[in-house]
Amino acid sequence: DQRHSLMASVDYSYGTGKKYNGPILFGRKVLQDAGANIIMTAGSGTPYSKQSNITQEAASGINDRSTLEGSLNGSRLPWQFRLSMKLNKNFVINWTDKKKSNLNVYVQVQNLLDAKNVISVYRATGNPDDDGYLTDAAAQNSINSKNDPDSFRYLYSLAVNNPSNYSLP
């Protein structure tokens, strides 16, 4: 249930032959039959159900019950933004007088601005890389009773920092 979704595309290509209106370097039409395309996409966040209590999300084998805060799907993830670009150039390859081929060479860059788009969060904090367990006052006795509490905190923070909570770069 994404409420708002925007997409814009800008495409510009130089022509060939007499239609070419681009730069000429050393007598050559360097951008002849070349083009650029930029695509911008943006969207409002999707819903999730916020929980009121902290649970141990990154530990396996732990079955904590979560308590709903607010209404079902009453919270929203942040907006997402992505800018991508594609540059291309066509080349004509003449094999013989009657036989020729077209070759299109392009470079495509996804997520040009390297935006960190959040696609999932921990329901208690609304944060993509912290479930709140390590700083929860109620969890401190359990954490301090571990064989090595500092090691537990370090390894738990690694497990909570899940790259799957972000879109691909």
Predicted regions located by residue number:
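Membrane-embedded beta-strands of outer-membrane beta-barrel proteins
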Residues: 8-10, 85-87
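C-terminal beta-signal and adjacent terminal beta-strands/loops
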Residues: 17-20, 24-64, 78-82, 89-169
